[in-house]
């Protein structure tokens, strides 16, 4: 069996209806894993499940709500059997002026980007402990490591920095019962939400969206922004036996941005 083969593995993908979660779930499935998708909205889940395979189960879940996460674990075990992989790809980015922001919106980002990860890691962590095995992979960002000159990113950067430290802390805590905890820190990825931001920024700069995307890629060593598919190899590695002795790490498939940041 290949080091990267996921045959016999069962993965729950949080944020499975989003651009990145969907791509990574598809990558898991293509490498042999059975997957179950969870997200806060049903329509994107339906579309993602149909894209991956007709038999892919899904469950609408608000990962900030404890009872819903607990129910998701039970549902996932009923559908797939023993869960071996948890991918935390939930969360969102919204611009906040650090001198003028709404606390309710800020708390919503904290809940989506970090509280939900604590919640899923708690309940799936218990399941992993019972089985003495598990892989937790969380979606961080280069913005958890390096700031950006653009205004409005303080809240997002703070939540992604928290993801990195949660990853390290859980790795230390969960390691004794055979669970690895790692994260992926991508650069800009053109998800539907990011495309909306590109359109806004392009208009502000009086350029086309394609021109704006090229401008963003110009400062990256590989001279382009990434895609969700660029993250699949890293995710499969972290979900597979190839990474069994790696824990507490954030890996950066970012085109080299953190090398110069």
Describe these PLM feature segments.
Residues 97-98, 102-110, 216-217:
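Substrate-binding pocket helix/loop in short-chain dehydrogenase/reductase
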């Amino acid at each position: 069996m290949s080091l990267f083969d996921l045959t016999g593995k069962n993965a729950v993908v949080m944020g499975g209806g989003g651009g990145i979660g969907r791509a990574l779930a598809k990558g898991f499935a293509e490498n042999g894993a059975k997957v179950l998708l969870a997200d806060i909205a049903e329509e994107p889940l339906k579309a993602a499940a149909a894209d991956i395979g007709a038999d892919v189960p899904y469950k609408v879940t608000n990962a900030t709500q404890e009872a819903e996460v607990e129910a998701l674990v039970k549902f996932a075990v009923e559908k797939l059997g023993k869960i071996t992989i948890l991918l935390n790809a939930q969360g969102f980015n919204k611009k906040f002026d650090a001198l003028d922001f709404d606390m309710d919106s800020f708390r919503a980002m904290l809940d989506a980007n970090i509280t939900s990860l604590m919640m899923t890691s708690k309940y799936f962590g218990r399941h992993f402990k019972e089985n003495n095995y598990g892989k937790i992979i969380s979606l961080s960002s280069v913005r958890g490591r390096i700031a950006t000159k653009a205004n409005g990113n303080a809240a997002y950067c703070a939540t992604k920095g928290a993801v990195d430290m949660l990853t390290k802390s859980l790795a230390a805590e969960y390691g004794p019962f055979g669970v690895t905890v790692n994260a992926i820190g991508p650069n800009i990825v053109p998800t539907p939400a990011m495309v909306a931001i590109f359109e806004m920024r392009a208009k502000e700069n009086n350029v086309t969206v394609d021109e704006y995307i090229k401008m963003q890629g110009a400062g990256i060593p590989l001279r382009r922004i990434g895609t969700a598919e660029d993250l699949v190899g890293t995710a499969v590695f972290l979900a597979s036996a190839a990474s069994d002795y790696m824990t507490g790490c954030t890996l950066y498939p970012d085109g080299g941005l953190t090398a110069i940041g």
